[in-house]
C-alpha cells in the first residue's frame, strides 16, 4: 500500500478485513482472513487497483520476477510527473527497469502520442508502465 500511496500518489478508497466464503475467489479456503485495500487514482472510474493480502493463514511469497512472460500483468498508469515518480521510486527502493525516457506511440485514434515513460516493478514484482503525456 505504501508504494502505491507514497510513490505513485494513489489514495486509499477501501481498507478492511475480508473473511473468505470459499466460493468467489480462486485462492484460499473458506474462513481464511485477508486484508483488501483498494487504491484509487485521480479518476477512480478508470484507475483503481485492489491489493489483497492473505493474513491468516499467510500464503508463501511467489518467486521474484525479472522479466515479463506470457500471461503476466502490466499496469499502465498515467500521471503528470514521471521524473518525480522516478525519484520517489528510487528513494523507496523500487526496482527500476527504465528511468524516465521519451516515448512515442500511435494512439487508439491513430494520432501519435508523445510521452515520458518510466518502467518499474512494484514491491510484489508486478510491472508498471507510468506515462506522462505531452499533448
Explain the meaning of each model-derived region.
Residues 1-46, 91, 111:
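Core segments of cupin and vicinal oxygen chelate
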Amino acid at each position: 500500500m505504501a508504494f502505491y500511496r507514497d510513490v505513485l500518489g494513489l489514495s486509499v478508497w477501501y481498507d478492511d478485513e475480508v473473511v473468505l466464503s470459499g466460493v468467489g475467489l480462486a485462492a484460499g479456503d473458506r474462513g481464511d482472513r485477508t486484508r483488501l485495500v483498494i487504491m484509487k487514482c485521480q479518476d477512480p472510474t478508470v484507475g483503481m487497483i485492489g491489493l489483497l493480502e492473505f493474513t491468516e493463514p499467510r500464503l508463501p511469497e511467489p518467486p521474484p520476477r525479472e522479466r515479463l512472460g506470457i500471461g503476466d500483468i502490466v499496469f499502465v498508469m498515467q500521471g503528470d510527473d514521471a521524473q518525480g515518480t522516478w525519484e520517489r521510486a528510487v528513494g523507496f527502493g523500487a526496482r527500476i527497469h527504465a528511468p524516465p525516457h521519451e516515448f512515442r506511440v500511435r494512439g487508439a485514434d491513430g494520432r501519435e502520442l508523445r510521452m515520458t515513460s518510466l518502467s518499474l516493478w512494484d514491491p510484489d514484482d508486478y510491472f508498471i508502465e507510468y506515462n506522462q503525456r505531452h499533448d
